[in-house]
Amino acid sequence: MRRITWCVAALVAIAFGIQVGNARVYGKAFEKATHGKVALKSCDVIGFGPDGVLLVGDGAAASIYAIQTGEGKSTKQLTGTITGINAKLAAAIGAKPDGIEILDMAAHPTSGTVYFAARKQDDKIPLILTVNAAGEVGLFNTDSVEYARVQLPSKPESKITKVSDVAWVDDKLIASAGAAETFASKIFIVKTPLTHDASGELHSAETYHVAHGKWETKAPMSTIMPFQEDGKTYVAGAFACTPVVKYPVEALKADANVKGTSVIELGSGNRPLDMFTYSKGGKEFVLANTFRFHHARAPVGPSPYWTVKFERGLLDEEQNVNEKAVWRTKKGTPNSDKITVVEAYHGVTQMDRLGETNVVALRENADKTLDLAVLELP
């Protein structure tokens, strides 16, 4: 009985990275972690890795933090709509409804808890808030947690300015970021399992911007997404003005400058926010939401925030790429029946997958208040 009990304890330890006897045992995410306070300087972006590990991009510290949340699988998920979620999140920290800025949002892959990267407006302190399946708002306390910090190479002449996205791809942690230099668009690769205080590899990304008709190095990669093509792993990145570009992960070598392949052009005047794959009706799609900074002069819909759905197979294109990449529209009219605007998602400022059939979305209303809504995948 004692042996069985120990084995069960060991399995729990492997899942959550806890102490068994005198040994520290970790899951897929960590090779070596540490315990203590995560003192964030910024909270640019969040995401999740294996075992529900929370990934936090801290551009001000040129670091990525991987933090154990302690959450397991839940049989319940958030449903319906929580109106005025911005006021409820602010109230959790004693602030007025306009007292916080929501920077990013991600759903825990097993518990369904929604995490928010936020910043207080008065003192600019970064923090992480949560909403559970019951709609209860909480503050995620990072004062005493199991975590690993990965340092991103940052020199005075190429200082990291912001981490724009993080993703766990096979056995690698990948982050996109901006730097203050000619090759401003950066991709960072970190081998996993993670070791506390390890450093990531630096790559400079060069991209053909279809709408601009030229190769560029400064435009930031706003969001990244892993996918498989012919047995190889790729990272798809969406940039401002708005090409969707793919990079083979095997081509990302240390200190190398890499050229991506532009496969789709969503149109100039947009900044992508979130992007992920999903399946529906036996077909694979990609869902991406964007902020249109040319909304006043050329709106896509009633809100500057709009969402597009396209067939996943478009990412596999090898011939019609870069200068020949397919456009979402031409002269203001739809150009491909494989790329469609999702009108039901107008106003969505942040979104993430919630299970197999739904999306949890932060939606902006006409009065600038925010609702948290569970929507069906289109």
List PLM regions with ranges.
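Sequence/structural signature of beta-propeller domains
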Residues: 21-378
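Positively charged n-region of N-terminal signal peptides that target proteins for export
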Residues: 1-4
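Bacterial N-terminal signal peptides
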Residues: 8-19
